[in-house]
């Protein structure tokens, strides 16, 4: 779950699920850039921090959000988790960015044999399930769905036949 959408109830449910399924990884994923700002040397494009038993959704959201960095300059120390497959943590960060959320999320890796229980919990709690390949391939898919909305001739010296073309994504894109 993205840190911005996390509630204390959701965090408790995920913590309980990780314990019940003996998940090999339950952590708070942040981007390498955010880790650097928090003075945590990143080892990959995304790192995982241990979630303490007393950590709240607000604590994690505040850690993800840089707007209070100047008022709380001495955060930490942070306990790093051994992250699962870096492709998974990087995909979680990318998914947050695609959703235009802060690049941070609480993640659980399923233990072998517990994947079905995790998927059932996800379905019952309206939690997205996707594949890393779908996340990685999204920019190409999105680019292929662009439609031309207008174009205009822009004669330039030495390139008199130049045109500028504007495209729009199928969902309308972000506001400007």
Residue ranges and their predicted role:
Residues 1-176:
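Catalytic domains of riboflavin
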């Amino acid at each position: 779950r993205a840190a911005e959408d996390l509630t204390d109830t959701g965090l408790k449910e995920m913590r309980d699920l990780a314990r019940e399924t003996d998940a090999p990884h339950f952590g708070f994923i942040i981007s390498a850039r955010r880790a650097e700002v928090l003075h945590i040397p990143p080892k990959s494009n995304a790192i995982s921090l241990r979630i303490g038993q007393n950590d709240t959704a607000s604590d994690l959201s505040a850690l993800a959000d840089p707007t209070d960095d100047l008022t709380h300059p001495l955060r930490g120390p942070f306990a790093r988790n051994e992250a699962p497959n870096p492709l998974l943590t990087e995909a979680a960060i990318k998914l947050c960015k695609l959703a235009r959320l802060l690049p941070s999320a609480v993640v659980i890796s399923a233990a072998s044999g517990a994947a079905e229980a995790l998927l059932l919990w996800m379905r019952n709690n309206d939690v997205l399930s996707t594949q890393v390949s779908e996340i990685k391939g999204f920019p190409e898919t999105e680019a292929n769905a662009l439609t031309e909305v207008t174009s205009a001739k822009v004669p330039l010296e030495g390139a008199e036949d130049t045109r500028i073309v504007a495209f729009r994504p199928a969902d309308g894109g972000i506001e400007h």
